């Protein structure tokens, strides 16, 4: 019985290793992972939550909320159309830290962009 158990365990381990070689990790990536990799260090105006703007003083939560709700955008400069004059000056200060990619439903579903459930 012990030999049978060790044989079955060995077969399962070998099968798992073989599957790891046949199906690389990239096959398991989802749309959200891909989108996060595309934008790198920049904040994606079409796919980021309001919380992503906390790193830019003066933008969180008011300006960030307007940008998130006002999308989608085709370019970074389009986002300034939803802001007033004083908010535009703050936005322009950090403009180089933003990017725009196609909007993905997996990232934008529901109200996750407004409140993504991250609390201290």
Swiss-Prot record:
Keyword Transport set for record: yes
Localisation per UniProt entry: Cellular thylakoid membrane
UniProt function note: One of the extrinsic, lumenal subunits of photosystem II (PSII). PSII is a light-driven water plastoquinone oxidoreductase, using light energy to abstract electrons from H(2)O, generating a proton gradient subsequently used for ATP formation. The extrinsic proteins stabilize the structure of photosystem II oxygen-evolving complex (OEC), the ion environment of oxygen evolution and protect the OEC against heat-induced inactivation.
Subunit structure: PSII is composed of 1 copy each of membrane proteins PsbA, PsbB, PsbC, PsbD, PsbE, PsbF, PsbH, PsbI, PsbJ, PsbK, PsbL, PsbM, PsbT, PsbX, PsbY, Psb30/Ycf12, peripheral proteins PsbO, CyanoQ (PsbQ), PsbU, PsbV and a large number of cofactors. It forms dimeric complexes.
Family: Belongs to the PsbU family.
Name of encoding gene: psbU
GO CC aspect terms: extrinsic component of membrane; photosystem II oxygen evolving complex; plasma membrane-derived thylakoid membrane
Natural source organism: Prochlorococcus marinus (strain MIT 9303)
Membrane topology summary: Peripheral membrane protein
GO BP terms in the entry: photosynthesis; photosystem II stabilization
Keywords linked to the UniProt accession: Electron transport, Membrane, Photosynthesis, Photosystem II, Signal, Thylakoid, Transport
Protein name listed in UniProt: Photosystem II extrinsic protein U
